[in-house]
Amino acid sequence: MDPMTNNIVTLPGSKVELFLEKGFDIWLHSYFVTGLVQLAREGTISLALMRRHDQVRCLAIQQEDYPLLLLKCTAPHHARPRLVCFDPRDQSDVWQKKALDECDLYFKRSTHPPDTAKLTPSQQSKVRPINPMFATWSPHAGGWTARMYWAFVRSALLQITKGQPLREAFNTCLRSCHNFASLSSVELYEDTPHGEKRPQVLFQTRLWDPSEEKGSWVDQCNRERVEMVRVLRTRLGNRCVGGLIRTPYAEKHYPDLLSNLTPTSKAKRPEFIRLCRQFLIRVNIKALFDAIPYSLGETLAANNCLVSETIRNSFATPLIADKHYLVFSTPNECADRCLELLDSPAKAQRLREEAHTYYRAAVCPKEAMRTYLTQALA
């Protein structure tokens, strides 16, 4: 199926089983699980926790420190179930090799063809790119919300039986519960081309503290982000909103560039998400390792005009420059693209309409997971 057409693929009689043990991370995996819950709610699939005898195989595949989501997918027309994994890590050159060998398909968030080409032909044939995504949860998840909390508790109990100190296991469980509770609903992110927007540009970014992070990338990354804030504020004036997220390092070294928006801690996520929806334009820059930031998926959901630094990685459904978003490679180019949209409401509206079509077909969790399951069970 072409995800950009109106042909809706259903998966009648298909069953998906979730592995929520070792390696499960609710913040990184919430998007995928949300889509599965939504598909189950509409009756497209049946969704269940993985049975114990299947978990043994997954435990042998999974690594404690690698946030991989494993699914067992069964379709009526297949004699053998498919084992599928989702890898949300930033790095395009880092793989969970055991999963690459054992799984039928390996969906990866950061997929860069030159890095994929370094794998064996057999491994390459299993790799599939993932569309832009973001951390979220469904308000209509029903019993799955309770199952998530129970999964965190059960994981902690399992770690205690393996000898992990009680306090450490408890803190891990508490952190997972907090992250889960802080997830915002899909609907909170979303807007349509009919929604009114403030004629301003939103750009927020974080600096890394060189005393805490090591590597030559730290200084370069910080310099680029500081320059972006300065250029946008100089070129756009009060039509540029945001700046450097408030951290001790940013407050000490760049007090004049601090953000004028609310702090973006997870505890205040709903407030920040509602605020971000208001702006006509949102600027996105690459994350570490050239990864696609979650904010790009959030921007598409909010139907802000997306002005993005050149995107290196691949998507399952192509995101097309000058159709779905405008692209830049320097801070001054970014300011130029923003001014184009601010000065041409008609162009901004067309961009929002095309981006909304893309979001509904390729990024909203339910349709994204429909696409991935269709590939897995083809």
Model-derived features: where do they sit?
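Catalytic binding pocket for nucleotide-activated donors in carbohydrate/polymer assembly enzymes
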Residues: 257-261, 271-378
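Nucleotide-sugar donor-binding catalytic core of glycosyltransferases
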Residues: 2-7, 13-74, 78-293, 307, ...
